[in-house]
Amino acid sequence: MTDHRGAWLEIDLEAIRRNIGLVRTVVRPAAVAQVVKAEAYGHGMVPVSRAIEPVVDAFCVATIDEALTLRPEVGKRILMLYPVPHQALPEALEHDIEIPVMSAADLEAIQAAARDDRPPVRIHLGVETGMGRGGLPPENVVAVAAATQADPRLQLAGLWSHLHSPEDPPTSDGQLLRFDIATTALREARIPVPPRHAAASGGIFTGDEPSLDFVRSGIASYGVLDEGLPLAPDAQEAAARLRPAMSLKARPIAFSRVPEGGTVGYGGTWTACLLYTSDAADDVSTV
């Protein structure tokens, strides 16, 4: 069937790969886990993930459905960013999805679903540092980590948090202090500290949070950064070279000439103004 659509999105997969390369220049030697939740921010989770798998170390998703859709498409690690519904844990573990533990109840549910005949379940302990969306208080991390270590069916694969305001260094510093409390407590308990991750796109380029062992790159890899971020000096060049991977294109369906003072659109939201031209009217294209 002939495609008659008048507007479409074009996704530049090579631009995403280049942007990830720029992220690496900022965070190396830290590893890069690419966030592909919400259809890779609208860019298409499966085609994007296939294209970038050679240049990333892992993938991050938000829902178990996303994880299960992605699993047959890529061979690298897939990390959930939110707790898995307990009834879905057996399927998640069957497909080697890495699971966040945000409470003692989460750990108990994983232990109930874990099997002796499978590789150890890789879990990441989430630390509540101020985001307010759940997580272990720093003082509770040791108990949950010790329970994980004691279970041969489990592997402590990560310690993580998320800074909610990377544009505000004092707020981020306070969160990092709480994250460090958890890290120090593990060391004092002689529990090996697993790979740590806290930086998302904002933190990668502001330098407000350390790269630690790996970063979770989100919208930056698609060529977008929030306005007003106080960029770290050593990240400014890379930030300036990021390129949006998505283009919205459309075919014109009509052309018209609008005289000065004429309006366009519902409510006359645009008014022709001929201050900068000697023409008698503005050229308007409807797309």
What role is predicted for each listed range?
Residues 42-44, 261, 281:
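Glycine-centered small-residue hotspots that permit tight backbone geometry or close packing
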Residues 76, 95, 246-251, 275:
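A generic structural signal for short beta-strands and their flanking turns/coil linkers
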Residues 172, 176-272:
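Anionic-ligand-binding alpha/beta catalytic cores of soluble enzymes and soluble regulatory domains
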Residues 3, 7-10, 15-18, 30-197, ...:
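Active-site-proximal beta-alpha core segment in soluble small-molecule metabolic enzymes
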Residues 23-28:
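Glycine-rich phosphate/diphosphate-binding loops that line cofactor/substrate pockets in enzymes
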Residues 276-283:
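Conserved small/polar residues in nucleotide/adenosyl-binding loops
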